[in-house]
């Protein structure tokens, strides 16, 4: 569980230019065994192409976004087949778009937890190292205490799910992005 870098270049969400891959590999003697590629960089790729590009460029694994897996209709058995062919590790990034674990709206908060659970089940099926979760955000400015309490409640539920399903969870430290 020694992931030190996960590459995610939002400006290149549809492809990874070869020059970027080569630059990352060559600069400063980076240890490629510590670098995973975010699957969103290869949004339009099929699973085989995704595995092939990540492997061919010397990376150690894929940070698979559950939202992408579900939206693109990827197949679990196909993923496992490719995982057996390519020596790449997998970690899963939980669904996070349009969700908020700290929402004042109970329905949104409950659906957010359900989406994390679906992501966690996917991570278990894919034998992923862990599941990364976004912490949510304040619905209204100035309601920090209430938001923190709601987030704590959500994370306690996620912790119980983690114990039951058997997938480790990491909480991602977020930069300030509206609605993230």
Roles of regions detected by a PLM:
Residues 13, 20, 25-26, 138, ...:
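A generic alpha-helix propensity feature with a strong bias for hydrophobic helices
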Residues 1-6, 12, 175-178:
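Short intrinsically disordered, low-complexity coil segments enriched in acidic
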Residues 4, 8, 15, 22-124:
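N-terminal pre-domain/capping segments
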Residues 105-180:
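Active-site acidic/histidine proton-transfer and metal-coordination neighborhood
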